[in-house]
A protein has these predicted regions:
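An N-terminal assembly and electron-transfer interface module characteristic of large anaerobic redox
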Residues: 1-300
Length: 300
């Protein structure tokens, strides 16, 4: 039973199927619909579509209220309807819970108001990186990015170091394992690796494992110390306080700049609109900081 809306939901499902012929459709019941007791499954059964329809009943007040709880509900429902195996869902749920913990302890969800900050001057930070490479300093770039936003943060790695110092290749560490995650996530890793203009020295894990691949990257740098390192994507998941050397973070959140400085990063650069710029893409997209590095190479 859906109070006055069951027929509308059935018609919407039929229209969506007729228009797009999808293999899967997701139906999410939100606060108002769940409070009054709507039965999503009945409407789905009545629509009788030739595809798998996954209902997710989500509303405010559920569980602890973390923004990852809804994603966990989707994973559980996907298992129930045979979309993904239980083992894969459990792995992703573990990552989501670790991501929540990182945000609460090291990121934006620490419980206090954080003033937006657009970070350090991109030109000055780019010059610092280029000077270090020219001066034969050991430099590392760590890509610890989240899913599709990796298309933007990978652009920061996409410069030709030989134009700066052909004898000083930076170390590249990245969470671009193409064998981890669902096919869409694995394909992101494949696409980026094909477009990168440099070899990757160490792969820390998959693109949905950013809550734990930061530590893996740090462990690698402990064994291969550098003078300067740049962490792109989710830099607050990287234990900067444990790694010596000059540190630069590149983040997509103006409200992450202050927490990253508090963690110990010497410089923080903010890339704006990472999610909107990478929505639906399958290619590396231009980043302001990546563009600045490439431009500054020719400056003396």
């Amino acid at each position: 039973f859906i109070l006055g809306a069951s027929e509308k939901l059935e018609n919407t499902l039929k229209e969506a199927y007729d228009m797009f012929k999808p293999e899967f459709i997701g139906v999410v019941g939100t606060c108002a619909s769940m409070i009054i007791g709507e039965d999503l499954k009945e409407a789905i059964a009545n629509a009788n579509l030739d595809c798998t329809v996954i209902p997710v009943e989500s509303h405010g007040g559920f569980g602890e209220g973390d923004n990852t709880e809804g994603a966990i509900m989707v994973l559980d429902s996907a298992v129930e309807y045979g979309i993904i195996p239980r083992e894969e869902a459990d792995r992703q749920i573990e990552m989501l819970k670790k991501a929540t913990e990182i945000e609460k302890t090291r990121g934006m969800a620490q419980g206090k108001y954080i003033q937006p900050n657009f970070g350090d001057n991109k030109e000055e930070v780019a010059k610092k990186i280029i000077k270090a490479l020219r001066d034969n300093k050991k430099v590392a770039f760590v890509l610890n990015a989240k899913k599709e936003t990796s298309y933007l943060f990978a652009d920061i790695l996409n410069f030709d170091y030989r134009e700066i110092n052909p004898e000083n290749k930076p170390i590249i560490v990245a969470n671009l394992d193409e064998n981890i995650g669902l096919s869409r996530i694995r394909n992101h890793a494949v696409n980026i690796k094909q477009e990168l203009k440099t070899d990757i020295d160490y792969i820390t894990g998959g693109l949905d494992e950013y809550p734990v691949t930061g530590k893996a990257a740090a462990d690698y740098l402990k064994e291969n110390p550098v003078d300067l390192y740049v962490v792109c994507g989710v830099p607050h998941a990287f234990p900067v306080e444990e790694i010596e050397g000059e540190s630069i973070a590149v983040t997509d959140g103006p409200r992450l700049v202050e927490p990253l400085k508090d963690l110990g990063y010497d410089n923080v650069v903010a890339e704006l609109d990472a999610h909107s710029k990478t929505l639906g893409t399958d290619k590396i997209v231009f980043s302001d900081f990546g563009g600045m590095i490439r431009s500054a190479i020719d400056w003396k």
